[in-house]
Amino acid sequence: MSTYAIIDGKMLQIGDQFDHYQIQAYMAQGGMSDIYRAFDLVNRREVVIKIPDQSMLGDPAQFERFQRELEVMKTLDHPTILKGLGSGKYNRVPYLVTEFVNGQSLRALIETSAPFPQEQVLSLIRKIADGMAYCHKNDVIHRDLKPENILITTDGQPVIMDFGLALTKGAHRVTYSNLSATMGTPDYMAPEQIEGQRGDQRTDVYALGTIMYEMLVGKMPFTGDNNMAIMAQHLNGTAPRLDRVNTSISPQLAAIVATCLARNPDDRYPDMTALIEILDHSENADLTILEKVNSSTGSEKSLTQLHAIKGVLIAFGIMGGLVLLALGLQYLHR
């Protein structure tokens, strides 16, 4: 990806005018787009402009992701959702305009301040869940909820952004060549996403549970040397209970997060509204959950592990999958 967007063969620079917007600063790369802070010369306000990378323009699937974000943002209006202000084309290059939010990403805060106090986590997660409940009521599933896609304003309010992977009612399936750019981020992907399913409200519940886990202990529930290893953990592993990782975390809160992170979607909270209700009554509610013990042994355990390996291979669409699968079989029979 270019460091700056290239328009008609010329690199977009600070101070340049792009349509009726004056470029003020280069902010970041997001997905397959370049993101700028700009000044709207017509409406006299600061905005953010998202311009797709040239490589995206030649990739129908990636361009579909950009177009999907345009459509989704037109339908949403909520305090915790980044507000879309418009879109257009300039010199044949499409762009998306959103409000400018003065703050920083939740990722930046986690890197500098995690772990966070329980009360702070519950307050923030409650607000994020409220925004996601609004999305779900409007038939929008985010499917890429992660700290990088959540801004925290200077007064501590969360703002959810980047709906490029969102699933909407009646949306057709798009085939992508790049898994991580399409299905989500491996660290926050629900098992059903890894298996190639489209997902539903419970997919976002899983991602939010992962964010809670990371905020509370400063580490991910699943780790690995590479994306495949991380995805295999999501498919077949069980995250260590939070109250065992950090004994200061209440068993009730640990139970909430464990329920969000259940491998089987049917074992999670059915939607964000149910999660909000539990969070609101966490001090008094009976949050006891049954611990599921993996009693698989011998060939049953091997079959479970093999299923995880195959699921990751299918999700990645690896050309050399048969070779890796053979290595997996050899490992299981050692």
Which residues fall in each region the model found?
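Protein kinase glycine-rich loop
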Residues: Q24-G30, I35
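AlphaC helix of the eukaryotic protein kinase fold
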Residues: D53-T75
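Activation-segment/catalytic-loop signature of the eukaryotic protein kinase fold
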Residues: S87
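Conserved short submotifs of the Hanks-type protein kinase catalytic core
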Residues: N91-S105, L109
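Activation segment signature within eukaryotic-like protein kinase domains
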Residues: L124-I125
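Protein kinase catalytic-loop region centered on the HRD/HxD motif
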Residues: D130-V140
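Activation segment of protein kinases
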Residues: D155-P191, E195
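C-terminal lobe helix-coil module of Hanks-type protein kinase domains
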Residues: T185-L287
